[in-house]
């Protein structure tokens, strides 16, 4: 650090990490005192606020101040303070009952405190993990959110996860072991808890522990998780999380883990997860696409594995790119493309990050990468070489060249000599082409990315800089008025290169110096062209300007403003020109200045488009060298203007002379320069202002106002005056300065030598003189006018206001902010809430007139006058609104301009940064820009300002304007109003009552416009404050009821669509943004302990609280909580009063009920009156109200739920087994007691009560939790069967309604109506309602509901059946805690009911009954539901009621059993026994269902690590039995035809027919399980392969019967399966055996199978040389097959495998094919003399054809380039053009394909051929035979 040494003395502490740019500000010397005062204030006040337990406003106010402090100064505090801040915020964030919006605020601050983890080591800080886990559990897995008892914002998940990531490095050493204990018991792979466990582990597990703690860290879980990952398949959702965890682990511990054994698997998985389409006829597995790996993490993982002694990773990476390169070709497009592009962009970026960390980063406490595993130069070279080809292809991708450009930028930092030449090779031709402009934009954007590497040359690529001038000269034609995008990229290109290079002509040095290198001499002579380049560029710009003049581009009547495109071109033009002139030598500048001056003076431009552009160019010139340029321009303009205004009549002209306007415009732009240089001309300028400021012509006086505005800004602002790429510029003699050394040189942060413009006393005087001369008279005029003492026309008033506005915005930072007294009584606080004053470079001179005060006084008077006398003068009102908002906000820069400058700064920084070396090595201009932005940031830091009386007056004026009669005035005023609301502390509380005044129904005098305006003020703008929904009881208590009551206002009219829409928007916004507001604001003691430390760390001890204050604080905290509850109840009651008013329009009643539903909470029961009202709403006439009521009453029932007692058990005691020694998952002796056992069911009261029920299905599968909780026995639970007297008032209300038959009748009637035909589904809200009723009141309502249920079930209508299903599910779930007698009675009734229901099931309702049963069984002990399971298993497939009922019963049964997962093996066995005889079912729908049920039966049979063999059915036994039955098909030779019709024939059928029927069902099973199960039972299913090959057809034909179609799908799905290395030989055996089959269909299908299988398991195969050879042998053998189709497919397969580099075209293979080609054919005569019918090809012809096919496969395997061996192969092929068919056809096809694929880049490809070869080739490609 250049300034690192002296900081501790200056500050009194060693700062953690400050923002260095602050040290470069012109007033840097004053900042240390300022920041120290602010820091002391923050520490003192924040500590005090916490000790006084005042979360709001105190703590919130001061944490915001800390956030601002970090934004302004960085982490400019000592390490001790840093730790205290972190600890305090950690305690605050984890307060259990903290309001959610506060929690998010604290969390964001804590994240930014922990963001730079190198600043605090594990020694400095430890944070516990459990409070964070409890918070995530409470919020992300909230039990009450879905019932509407908690409202969390959408952002909360992201914030919490980021918070955990930030705290993770500081978890204690034992955290890993504790986390595993907590979450491993959840790891049951069939359950959703698996996803939860893995995502928690991914989020929390610390991976950056130091090496000596690895045994306490990842070593505890690494092997177990990795083997788990290796053995799963089909991407279950949690697999992605594991990958993210491994990626992070690998990245944090490079060199400490040996990943080599897993590399082939890792790459195979990554390749699979790209979901690329492969193979000749493929059906992609319907995997959930969202489950693919996150490319970002996959890339981090790959990067972390690179380097080190073994080079396997680079080898695999090269393999990966070889296999996917062709997908990058621009002609390919698909949804997979975005992933591929992201891969390209991220990889180089990650490698750069890693290189930076290993070679350049400052060492910190984080473990460094060991020397042995760092990336060597050779590693880097290999990497760059492997990725170059895809990147070059991606340059022209359909999705644009952005990713390629970013990749090239990073690659060029590593190896410019490998990267830049190929890019240039593509760029030069693109610059010449006229027909393909997209090539130009793509290549230029890529060259911009590599510009810095190109220009700086360096040891790797010294010849780089020589390309710069040729590129610049060739790019000039891109400045083309007819092609906008080309124009913009060219400007960017030229600007980028000019910024990097001083444009100085050094050619004279060639004579003087002889110590120059070859490249330097070449560059010196080239620089002679700079001048030429600049002049040519200017000519191009002038042409562009002339063609875009207003007269040329549109009619006079059209818009006067520039179009969006024009303004972009204007910006590009002026910034590029300004960059070029900044970088010019004096000599070149003079020539350019002369040229631009002549152009500007010799023409007259219109002032709207071309005039603006020319004035911009002139301004750019003047800015670079103010003295010389002003001498040229200023007197000229002044003279012309004076001359043209000699005659006083000009003042009153409506239209001014074109030349006068143009010169005025030019003058107003060239005065935007260093204010000091304007002083010599001040008299002339003032004279011009006198002459022009009061033109009658608006265009004239506007330009004159601009001049005044710019003069004021130039004199009073602080800004840098030059942006040259080298400090001090290039104006030095060449003898002492050699510019070429500075090509591409970065700025040096510690020697920037910024030249600042700081206003001098003389300039200040000039500014005040201007204000006194021009502003004061206007204000006096307006003052007289608004007193009625002076007549003025509207135009004159507008002119006055325009001058006032320009004076105000010109001198914004000169005028001190408005003063006055504070508005008190808005909030009470025991902590000071003072605003912070920042020094921004100017000491305000209070002895002079403060014009800001004066303007505000005059304007308010004027505003009231206009509103009272001429409200329709909207143009004046617009100006007044602008002035008010600038009076309030403006201190020299506007927020939106600053934001867009910050954005463009970031863009430029990104496009030219060097991430490899880091350390802010940006170009000097960019660094200066950043310092300037830092200064502007300080001027804009205004939030948290005190709310003073002056502000109050102006805000009230804005509110009056926001409710005025004119829509446009309202709109503009509202925007200003919203901005101001966000600026002043607590002002909303002052304004809400004033806004609501307009909505009061009693008022008779409110107009519709005022009503609308007030509603808009409540609604707020996008992203700003929304008054209607402040997170504060006191505000909501006022706003919500007022909105409802406004429905009775006279101004309200439901006929007006705009008003209806406003209410809709308001309601929608409140629902979207509402977050639960806190009722408990207590501060725990833990926070207070840290606050005391923090206060003592503050240097000022004056604020330490007094003991009396502390006592008062505790009292205040209690009062605040009571007050919150009172406000809450008041709000609910007021809303009820509003909603029940007579005559209230229905719309408002609905909105009101919506508001009530937001007020449900989980920590406070809704007031009784509201409960009564909402229960009555269940039978409201309006459907929308009934829907809301159903949800709300379900929530109320949850609030009224009584808690059930739990107790801890020891599972080992219950099972009587000891704890297992080693880790074992699945069916173990100690969890057998959990399983369903029909011989030991709890079907008596004693058995029921002694049975230990475990409801959650995942417990016990993986391991038992530390503390296993189950429900305590019934006698300890809340009483069941209470009488009405024993209930609370709230419970009685619900009880009374649901025991009232009429009420229930009506409710059921409503519930069984249909809502949207055919769209309705089982409704979980209604289910929750019934579940709540039966849970809270056990069977009290059963007698009333029973008859309804019986009626509903008997009716087969869709809506009635659905209603029954919802109630039944609610009953079964609600009966969880009933006593045995009640449950038994319930089931006696339900069994009958369900039997009826299942026999009445229909197409529309079967999925609802499925949902009903699945919902009833989820997370329930199966032994509790034994009645249900026995019922469902009575006769799953009986044939009664037809095939449809069977299919439905199976569906319902599957729903129930699937929820039970591993706990019902007995039932699964019983079901399988039932189904096996039925597998030959004839009906398709039953077969499909059986297939699906089988998948679930075998789901539990998984081969995961440490898993015991399951008690549930095993796939292998089942497949064995099936294969026996399929034997008749296996043995048969001929192709299998499906001749079984869909009805059952009479009598016994032969074995073969039975086997075909069986096969059909088995196919359905394989299809269903392909996408679902974790592990395909590969070894077993492999044995079915030969049969599938036999059945599957070759062509795609929709007429094929089901059997063939399914067989084809199964093959496709199986070929995509993930193979374990042991399985590869098995599969190859099956394929070999099939390749000998007599059916050519089977042989053909083997090939398509190989294509997909190899690609989807690429690295597993490549890893094993034997299997590669096996595949190769198979293909070569099939290439000589007697069937033509098989040969051709073998060739296609070969070509594909060559293309993805699985096989290589080695000499042996080439020789093999060439030999086959030379096979002699029988003489033609002999052939003809044979029989006419003799079409079987002779063996010789087959062999020769095989050879030709082999050669053609090689040619087609390189579709996008010409390798060295290709020309010769093409020649070999051409010999066979006249061979007999099918050889001739093959040759033709190959040649036409070659021509098609190589046509695009033929110029480049031509180079590979000799002249002779080219002649032959040209003949071939256009020979007559080509068209024959």
From Swiss-Prot:
Cellular location(s): Cytoplasm, Cytosol; Nucleus; Nucleus speckle
Quaternary context: Homodimer. Interacts with the 20S and 26S proteasomes.
InterPro entries for this protein: ARM-like, ARM-type_fold, Blm10_mid, HEAT_PSME4, PSME4, PSME4_C
Function as written in the Swiss-Prot or TrEMBL entry: Associated component of the proteasome that specifically recognizes acetylated histones and promotes ATP- and ubiquitin-independent degradation of core histones during DNA damage response. Recognizes and binds acetylated histones via its bromodomain-like (BRDL) region and activates the proteasome by opening the gated channel for substrate entry. Binds to the core proteasome via its C-terminus, which occupies the same binding sites as the proteasomal ATPases, opening the closed structure of the proteasome via an active gating mechanism.
Cross-referenced Pfam families: HEAT_PSME4, HEAT_PSME4_mid, PSME4_C
Keyword Transferase: no
Gene3D superfamilies, per the entry: Leucine-rich Repeat Variant
Gene Ontology MF terms in the entry: lysine-acetylated histone binding; peptidase activator activity; proteasome binding
Positions annotated as HEAT repeat: 462-506, 985-1024, 1164-1202, 1339-1377, 1621-1659, 1665-1703
Protein name: Proteasome activator complex subunit 4
Source organism, top-level taxon: Eukaryota
């Amino acid at each position: 650090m250049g300034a690192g040494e002296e900081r501790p003395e200056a500050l009194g502490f060693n700062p953690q990490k400050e923002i260095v740019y602050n040290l470069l500000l012109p007033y840097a010397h004053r900042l240390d005192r300022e920041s120290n005062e602010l820091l002391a204030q923050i520490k003192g006040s924040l500590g005090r606020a916490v000790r006084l337990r005042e979360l709001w406003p105190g703590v919130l106010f001061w944490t915001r101040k800390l956030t601002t402090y970090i934004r302004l100064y960085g982490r400019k505090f000592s390490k001790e303070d840093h730790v205290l801040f972190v600890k305090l915020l950690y305690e605050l964030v984890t307060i259990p009952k903290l309001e959610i919006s506060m929690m998010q605020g604290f969390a964001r601050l804590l994240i930014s405190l922990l963001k730079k983890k190198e600043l605090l080591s594990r020694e400095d800080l430890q944070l516990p993990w459990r409070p964070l886990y409890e918070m995530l559990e409470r919020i992300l897995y909230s039990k009450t959110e879905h019932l509407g008892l908690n409202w969390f914002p959408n952002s909360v998940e992201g914030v919490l996860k980021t918070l955990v990531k930030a705290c993770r490095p500081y978890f204690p050493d034992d955290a890993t072991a504790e986390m595993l204990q907590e979450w491993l018991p959840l790891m049951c792979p069939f359950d959703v808890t698996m996803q939860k466990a893995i995502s928690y582990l991914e989020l929390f597990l610390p991976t950056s522990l130091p090496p000596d703690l690895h045994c306490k860290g990842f070593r505890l879980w690494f092997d177990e998780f990795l083997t788990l990952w290796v053995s799963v398949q089909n991407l279950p959702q949690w697999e992605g999380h594991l990958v993210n965890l491994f990626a992070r682990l690998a990245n944090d511990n490079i060199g400490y883990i040996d990943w080599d054994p897993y590399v082939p698997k890792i790459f195979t998985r990554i390749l699979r997860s790209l979901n690329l389409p492969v193979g000749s006829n493929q059906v992609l597995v319907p995997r959930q696409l969202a489950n693919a790996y996150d490319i970002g993490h996959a890339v981090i993982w790959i990067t972390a594995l690179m380097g080190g002694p073994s080079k396997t990773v680079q080898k695999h990476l090269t393999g990966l790119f070889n296999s996917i390169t062709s997908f990058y070709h621009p002609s390919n497009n698909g949804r997979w493309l975005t992933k591929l592009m992201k891969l390209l962009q991220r990889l180089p970026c990650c490698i750069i990050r890693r290189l930076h960390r290993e070679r350049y980063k400052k060492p910190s406490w984080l473990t460094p990468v060991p020397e042995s595993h760092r990336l060597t130069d050779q590693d880097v070279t290999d990497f760059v070489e492997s990725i170059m080809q895809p990147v070059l292809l991606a340059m022209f991708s359909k999705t644009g060249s952005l990713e390629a450009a970013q990749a090239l930028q990073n690659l060029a930092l590593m190896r410019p000599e490998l990267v830049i030449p190929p890019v240039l090779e593509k760029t030069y031709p693109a610059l010449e082409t006229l027909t393909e402009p997209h090539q130009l934009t793509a290549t230029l954007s890529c060259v911009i990315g590599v510009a810095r590497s190109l220009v700086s040359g360096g040891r790797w690529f010294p010849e780089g800089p020589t390309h710069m001038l040729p590129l610049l000269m060739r790019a000039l034609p891109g400045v083309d008025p007819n092609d906008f995008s080309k124009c913009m990229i060219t400007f960017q290109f030229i600007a980028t290169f000019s910024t990097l290079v001083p444009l100085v002509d050094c050619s004279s040095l060639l004579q003087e110096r002889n110590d120059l290198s070859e490249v330097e001499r070449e560059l010196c002579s080239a620089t002679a062209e700079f001048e030429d380049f600049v002049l040519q560029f200017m000519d191009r710009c002038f042409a562009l300007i002339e063609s875009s003049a207003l007269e040329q581009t549109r009619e006079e009547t059209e818009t006067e403003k520039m179009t969006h495109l024009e303004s972009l071109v204007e910006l590009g033009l002026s910034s590029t020109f300004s960059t070029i002139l900044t970088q010019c030598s004096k000599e070149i500048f003079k020539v350019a200045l002369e040229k631009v001056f002549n152009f500007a003076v010799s023409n007259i431009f219109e002032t709207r488009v071309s005039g603006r552009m020319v004035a911009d160019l002139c301004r750019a010139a003047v800015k670079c060298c103010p003295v010389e340029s002003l001498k040229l321009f200023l007197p000229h303009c002044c003279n012309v203007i004076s001359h043209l205004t000699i005659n006083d009549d000009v003042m009153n002209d409506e239209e001014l002379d074109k030349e006068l306007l143009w010169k005025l415009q030019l003058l107003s732009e060239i005065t935007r320069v260093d204010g000091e240089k304007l002083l010599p001309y001040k008299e002339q300028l003032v004279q011009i202002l006198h002459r022009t400021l009061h033109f009658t012509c608006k265009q004239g006086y506007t330009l004159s106002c601009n001049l005044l505005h710019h003069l004021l800004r130039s004199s009073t602002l602080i800004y840098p005056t030059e942006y040259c790429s080298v400090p001090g510029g290039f104006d030095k003699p060449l003898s002492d300065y050699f510019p070429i050394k500075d090509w591409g040189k970065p700025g040096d942060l510690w020697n920037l030598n910024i030249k600042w413009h700081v206003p001098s006393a003389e300039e200040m005087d000039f500014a005040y003189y201007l204000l006194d001369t021009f502003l004061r008279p206007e204000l006096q005029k307006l003052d007289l006018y608004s007193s009625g003492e002076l007549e003025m026309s509207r135009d004159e008033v507008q002119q006055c206001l325009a001058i006032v506005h320009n004076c105000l915005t010109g001198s914004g930072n000169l005028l001190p902010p408005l003063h006055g007294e504070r508005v008190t009584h808005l909030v009470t606080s025991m902590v000071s809430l003072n605003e912070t004053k920042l020094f921004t470079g100017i000491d305000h001179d209070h002895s002079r007139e403060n014009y800001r005060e004066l303007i505000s006084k005059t304007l308010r008077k004027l505003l009231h006058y206009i509103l009272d006398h001429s409200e329709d003068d909207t143009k004046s009102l617009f100006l007044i609104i602008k002035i008010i908002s600038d009076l309030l906000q403006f201190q020299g820069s506007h927020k939106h301009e600053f934001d867009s400058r910050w954005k463009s700064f970031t863009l430029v920084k990104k496009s030219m940064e060097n991430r490899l070396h880091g350390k802010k090595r940006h170009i000097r201009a960019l660094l200066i820009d950043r310092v300037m932005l830092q200064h502007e940031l300080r001027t804009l830091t205004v939030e948290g300002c005190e709310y003073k009386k002056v502000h109050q007056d102006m805000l009230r004026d804005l509110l009056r304007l926001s409710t005025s009669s004119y829509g446009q005035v309202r709109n503009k005023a509202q925007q200003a109003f919203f901005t101001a609301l966000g600026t002043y502390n607590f002002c909303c509380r002052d304004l809400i009552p004033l806004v609501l005044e307009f909505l009061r129904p009693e008022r008779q005098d409110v107009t519709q416009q005022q009503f609308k305006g007030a509603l808009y003020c409540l609604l707020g703008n996008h992203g700003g404050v929304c008054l209607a929904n402040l997170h504060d009881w006191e505000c909501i208590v006022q706003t919500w009821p007022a909105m409802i009551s406004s429905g009775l206002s006279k101004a309200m009219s439901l006929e007006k669509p705009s008003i209806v829409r406003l209410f809709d928007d308001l309601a929608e916004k409140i629902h979207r943004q509402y977050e639960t507001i806190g009722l408990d604001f207590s501060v725990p003691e833990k926070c207070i302990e840290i606050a005391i430390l923090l206060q003592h760390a503050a240097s000022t001890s004056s604020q330490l609280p007094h003991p009396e204050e502390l006592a008062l604080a505790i009292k205040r905290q209690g009062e605040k909580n009571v007050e919150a509850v009172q406000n809450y109840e008041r709000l609910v009651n007021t809303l009820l009063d509003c909603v029940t008013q007579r005559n209230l329009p229905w719309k408002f009643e609905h909105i009101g009920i919506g508001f009530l539903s937001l007020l449900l909470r989980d920590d406070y029961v809704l007031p009784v009156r509201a409960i009564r009202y909402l229960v009555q709403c269940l039978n409201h006439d309006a459907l929308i109200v009934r829907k809301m009521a159903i949800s709300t009453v379900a929530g109320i029932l949850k609030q009224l739920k009584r808690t059930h007692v739990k107790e801890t058990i020891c599972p080992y005691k219950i099972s009587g087994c000891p704890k297992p020694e080693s880790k074992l998952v699945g069916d173990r002796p100690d969890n057998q007691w959990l399983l369903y056992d029909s011989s030991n069911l709890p079907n008596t009261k004693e058995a029921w009560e002694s049975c230990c029920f475990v409801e959650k299905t995942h417990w016990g599968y993986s391991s038992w939790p530390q503390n296993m909780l189950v429900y305590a026995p019934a006698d300890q639970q809340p009483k069941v069967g209470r009488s009405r007297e024993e209930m609370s008032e709230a419970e009685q209300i619900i009880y009374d309604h649901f025991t009232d038959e009429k009420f229930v009748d009506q409710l059921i009637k409503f519930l069984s109506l249909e809502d949207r035909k055919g769209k309705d589904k089982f409704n979980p809200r209604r289910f929750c309602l019934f579940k709540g009723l039966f849970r809270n009141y056990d069977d009290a309502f059963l007698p009333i509901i029973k008859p309804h249920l019986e009626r509903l079930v008997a009716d087969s209508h869709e809506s009635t059946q659905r209603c029954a299903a919802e109630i039944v599910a609610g009953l079964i779930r609600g009966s969880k805690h009933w006593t045995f007698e009640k449950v038994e009675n319930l089931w006696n009734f339900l069994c009958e009911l369900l039997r009826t229901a299942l026999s009445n099931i229909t197409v529309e309702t079967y999925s609802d009954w499925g949902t009903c049963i699945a919902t009833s069984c989820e997370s329930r002990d199966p032994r509790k539901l034994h009645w249900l399971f026995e019922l469902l298993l009575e006769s799953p497939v009986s044939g009664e009621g037809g095939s449809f009922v069977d299919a439905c019963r199976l569906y319902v049964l599957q729903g129930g059993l699937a929820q039970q997962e591993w706990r019902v093996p007995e039932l699964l066995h019983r079901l399988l026994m039932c189904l096996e005889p039925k597998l030959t079912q004839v009906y398709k729908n039953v077969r499909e269902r059986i297939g699906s049920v089988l998948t679930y039966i075998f789901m539990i049979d998984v081969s995961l690590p440490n898993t015991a063999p399951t008690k549930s059915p095993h796939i292998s036994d089942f497949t064995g039995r099936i294969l026996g039955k399929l034997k008749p098909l296996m043995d048969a030779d001929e192709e299998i035809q499906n001749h079984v019709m869909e009805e059952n024939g009479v009598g016994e059928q032969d074995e073969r027919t039975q086997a075909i029927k069986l096969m059909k069902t088995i196919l359905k099973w394989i299809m269903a399980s392909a996408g679902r199960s974790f592990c395909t039972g590969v070894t077993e299913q492999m044995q079915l392969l030969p049969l599938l090959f036999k059945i599957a057809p070759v062509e795609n034909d929709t007429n094929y019967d089901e059997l063939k179609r399914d067989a084809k799908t199964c093959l496709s799905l199986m070929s995509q399966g993930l193979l374990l290395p042991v399985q590869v030989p098995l599969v190859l055996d099956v394929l070999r055996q099939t390749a000998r089959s007599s059916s050519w269909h089977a042989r053909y299908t083997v090939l398509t199978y190989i294509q997909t299988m190899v690609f989807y398991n690429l690295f597993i195969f490549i890893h094993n040389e034997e299997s590669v050879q096996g595949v190769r042998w198979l293909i070569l053998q099939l290439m000589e097959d007697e069937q033509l189709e098989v040969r051709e497919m073998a060739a296609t397969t070969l070509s594909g495998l060559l293309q993805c580099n699985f096989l290589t075209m080695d000499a042996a293979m080439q020789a093999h094919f060439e030999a086959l080609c030379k096979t002699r054919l029988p003489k033609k005569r002999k052939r003809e003399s044979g029989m006419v019918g003799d079409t079987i090809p002779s063996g010789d012809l087959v062999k020769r054809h095989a050879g030709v096919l082999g050669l053609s496969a090689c040619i087609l395997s390189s579709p996008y380039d010409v390798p060295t061996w290709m020309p010769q192969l093409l020649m070999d092929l051409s010999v066979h053009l006249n061979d007999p068919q099918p050889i001739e056809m093959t040759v033709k096809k190959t040649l036409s394909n070659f021509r098609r694929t190589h046509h695009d880049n033929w110029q480049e490809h031509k180079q590979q051929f000799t002249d002779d070869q080219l002649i032959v080739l040209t003949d071939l490609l256009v020979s007559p035979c080509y068209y024959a």
